[in-house]
């Protein structure tokens, strides 16, 4: 046992002893629930922060505050609530009472204070502790440094502690909530209806990904946590809901990385009588307005760069993007779509770029891998990459002039994909053949290939109007809006390996 652990155990024991005494001497077994707060720290600062000391003395405002004790400096306690901090003042009489009643207050304790609002000599607001009550005794000490935990893993495992001591973490999560609300409000103003679709599927679908499997005991069947809501949302468009969206969780049984968490949040939406160009226009409008509303400007810092959400954003085909970022590769510069359809040629180009080639990869997958390795990391500014191959886009509409590609785009910022959208495939017979090709790919070893969904084919046979649909990764978008570089920092409780496993 380390000295640090021994010291912490000693502090916990001391606090438990204090709580035992408090239980005997105070009401509600030491956990009262009848104190009512009427003011938040930030509201008091906004309302009274510009007042002079004589003005506050004359006006005599009585306020009730409550929060966590974060610091003790002589007679002053720094009390933190959801909005910020404010000081409470304990004169010598109150200090004596606190010691007698509670054996003193500790950092982390939650208290309620009612008293008059004053201004200190340094210009800080404080509340006199005319009436006070210990609401919750903290049995564990907080980290000593107020800027947060130094160990990243502990920050994620004990997010509750991280949020207490780390203002940056609190602000990140507040911004996340604002981003989600702004997206929801934008969509509703565009006449989209918010819906909820199943989280458990009999057949996983809507994206090429490996699903999580669970078992329904009553039905005695395996079910899958959804990898995407796409097929259900398009069923709703078939049913006549022409503009729908959903903000919810998706689950993909894949690896962890700074940009991947197995449980993540997506906003997916579908609009009838539109195509993928309309989606790109809508995305530009949405992100520009949200950035301006939340940050006061469409230009946001991200790492060493400034990301400009103002638009319009470049629209570049995948093939041209590969050429743009491989200017010295003569073989790539000479590529045509006819050559991209030559698997052996594409595999050799990929190997020449030190890309490992899976035997089941199609021509489209090879093109996408080359793009991902050489072009994607360079896309720092908002950019639409278009003309995705049909064999990696099983739900997208084929292009009218080139059936090797689809009317699909992916949206990139900061060197990572943030959104994926396309004109929807509404040809039931073509969709049937694409599903069968996915089944063949799965049989060949591609764990992420889609399953065949017969009911979705039946829905298409009833008629899906010309439709465009898109998914936006909320977590990655929040990373951009908060200048954060790992997805774990924008998810309250990210997936972690259990501590008792190596």
UniProtKB/Swiss-Prot annotation:
<keyword id="KW-0436">Ligase</keyword>
<dbReference type="GO" id="GO:0000287">
    <property type="term" value="F:magnesium ion binding"/>
</dbReference>
<keyword id="KW-0479">Metal-binding</keyword>
<keyword id="KW-0067">ATP-binding</keyword>
<dbReference type="InterPro" id="IPR012340">
    <property type="entry name" value="NA-bd_OB-fold"/>
</dbReference>
<dbReference type="InterPro" id="IPR044136">
    <property type="entry name" value="Lys-tRNA-ligase_II_N"/>
</dbReference>
<dbReference type="Pfam" id="PF01336">
    <property type="entry name" value="tRNA_anti-codon"/>
</dbReference>
<feature type="binding site">
    <location>
        <position position="417"/>
    </location>
    <ligand>
        <name>Mg(2+) 1</name>
    </ligand>
</feature>
<keyword id="KW-0648">Protein biosynthesis</keyword>
<dbReference type="InterPro" id="IPR002313">
    <property type="entry name" value="Lys-tRNA-ligase_II"/>
</dbReference>
<dbReference type="GO" id="GO:0004824">
    <property type="term" value="F:lysine-tRNA ligase activity"/>
</dbReference>
<dbReference type="Pfam" id="PF00152">
    <property type="entry name" value="tRNA-synt_2"/>
</dbReference>
<dbReference type="InterPro" id="IPR004365">
    <property type="entry name" value="NA-bd_OB_tRNA"/>
</dbReference>
<comment type="subunit">
    <text>Homodimer.</text>
</comment>
<dbReference type="InterPro" id="IPR018149">
    <property type="entry name" value="Lys-tRNA-synth_II_C"/>
</dbReference>
<dbReference type="InterPro" id="IPR045864">
    <property type="entry name" value="aa-tRNA-synth_II/BPL/LPL"/>
</dbReference>
<dbReference type="GO" id="GO:0000049">
    <property type="term" value="F:tRNA binding"/>
</dbReference>
<dbReference type="GO" id="GO:0006430">
    <property type="term" value="P:lysyl-tRNA aminoacylation"/>
</dbReference>
<feature type="binding site">
    <location>
        <position position="410"/>
    </location>
    <ligand>
        <name>Mg(2+) 1</name>
    </ligand>
</feature>
<dbReference type="GO" id="GO:0005829">
    <property type="term" value="C:cytosol"/>
</dbReference>
<dbReference type="InterPro" id="IPR006195">
    <property type="entry name" value="aa-tRNA-synth_II"/>
</dbReference>
<feature type="binding site">
    <location>
        <position position="417"/>
    </location>
    <ligand>
        <name>Mg(2+) 2</name>
    </ligand>
</feature>
<keyword id="KW-0460">Magnesium</keyword>
<dbReference type="GO" id="GO:0005524">
    <property type="term" value="F:ATP binding"/>
</dbReference>
<protein>
    <recommendedName>
        <fullName>Lysine--tRNA ligase</fullName>
        <ecNumber>6.1.1.6</ecNumber>
    </recommendedName>
</protein>
<keyword id="KW-0547">Nucleotide-binding</keyword>
<keyword id="KW-0963">Cytoplasm</keyword>
<comment type="similarity">
    <text>Belongs to the class-II aminoacyl-tRNA synthetase family.</text>
</comment>
<dbReference type="InterPro" id="IPR004364">
    <property type="entry name" value="Aa-tRNA-synt_II"/>
</dbReference>
<keyword id="KW-0030">Aminoacyl-tRNA synthetase</keyword>
